[in-house]
Curated annotation (Swiss-Prot):
The keyword Kinase applies. InterPro entries: Adenyl_kin_sub, Adenylat/UMP-CMP_kin, Adenylat_kinase_CS, Adenylate_kinase_lid-dom, P-loop_NTPase. This is Adenylate kinase. Keywords: ATP-binding, Cytoplasm, Kinase, Metal-binding, Nucleotide biosynthesis, Nucleotide-binding, Transferase, Zinc. Its EC number is 2.7.4.3. It catalyses: AMP + ATP = 2 ADP.
Length: 209
């Protein structure tokens, strides 16, 4: 099962991909993870990627395509994979066609208001990286990490202005992919509003294994 998870930031793509990867035994390939690896190496390229992500904009097609192609060439993708966060543009989708055959494109259906509510409430520990949410996963003590007592912070790309910019970018550049893959009869719509357990159950009904 070679599939793409398509949807705005905050739609729950990463959460569902983790569960599907575990259940179906196929790798979850996130461009976010690929970017973070580049940033961690602190190369000139990694620093450029960090600056772009922090601003809420998108990394260039050429860089993203090269990172994804390299990952898809590994042996663990032979039985299938989940692409999360790629492609984001028609140009990337065209490039992907030259690399691998896609079986299904899962479209996460969710409103912008719900995305803003989810993302603006996220908090991350500045020390250990554990994630919380002011509404859904509250820390025991406001502003303090349950695990290490570190200070909780808002990531630059979780600030409302950055979220709105990311959503605008998504609607302008990525949403056209829905039409692109609809014409290829690959789109499968999933309601991304319910809790993650219900979204997973819906996925398993559509893709029994």
């Amino acid at each position: 099962m070679n599939c793409i998870f398509l949807g705005p930031p905050g739609a729950g793509k990463g959460t569902l991909a983790f569960e599907v990867s575990k259940s179906y035994k196929i790798p979850h390939i996130s461009t976010g993870d690929l970017f973070r690896a580049a940033i961690k190496e602190q190369t000139d390229l990694g620093k450029k990627v960090k600056a772009v992500i922090d601003s809420g904009a998108l990394v260039s097609d050429d860089l993203t395509i090269a990172l994804v192609k390299e990952r898809l060439e590994r042996d663990d993708t032979k039985k299938g994979f989940i692409l999360d966060g790629f492609p984001r543009t028609i140009a990337q989708a065209d490039a992907l066609e030259d690399i691998v055959k896609i079986d299904s494109v899962i479209n996460f259906d969710i409103s912008d208001d719900e995305v803003i509510k989810r993302l603006s409430g996220r908090r991350v520990c500045s020390s250990c990286g554990q994630s919380f949410h002011i509404e859904f996963v509250k820390p025991k003590k406001e502003g303090i990490c349950d695990s290490c007592s570190g200070d909780l912070m808002i990531r630059p790309d979780d600030k409302i202005e950055a979220i709105q910019k990311r959503l605008e970018t998504y609607r302008n550049q990525t949403a056209p992919l829905i039409d692109y893959y609809t014409k290829k009869d690959l789109i499968v719509n999933i309601d991304a509003r319910p809790a993650s357990e219900k979204v997973l159950a819906s996925f398993k009904v559509k893709f029994p294994h």
